[in-house]
Amino acid sequence: MLIKQFSRRSKNTKVQILLAFAALFVLAVGSYASESKKLDLRDALFSAMFSADYQLNPQERGCRYFLGECKKTSECCEHLACHDKHKWCAWDWTIGK
């Protein structure tokens, strides 16, 4: 009698543990998807914030300044490079005169 009760409890515990792992898996997947959407939205907002080039026309100055919109690095001023993802001129980590 005691062994049957222990066996039932053991099966019940196994089911509870399995359900707990399944719930944790669902929460982890949901959290990852939510974080991915937040990152995409944050990148889109950040890109839109700096995409407008409020400075002078690039033809007038010959190059685009820091955070100016660009398509290739040659459009940016010295010590700036066109950022691959956001398409603006960012510092290329060089220092010089």
UniProtKB/Swiss-Prot annotation:
GO terms for molecular function: ion channel inhibitor activity; toxin activity. It is found in: Secreted. The keyword Signal applies. Disulfide bonds join 63-77, 70-82, 76-89. The keyword Disulfide bond applies. Residues 34-61 form a propeptide. Expressed by the venom gland. SUPFAM superfamilies: omega toxin-like. GO terms for cellular component: extracellular region. Residues 1-33 form the signal peptide. Belongs to the neurotoxin 10 (Hwtx-1) family. 12 (Hntx-12) subfamily. Ion channel inhibitor. This is U6-theraphotoxin-Hhn1a 3.
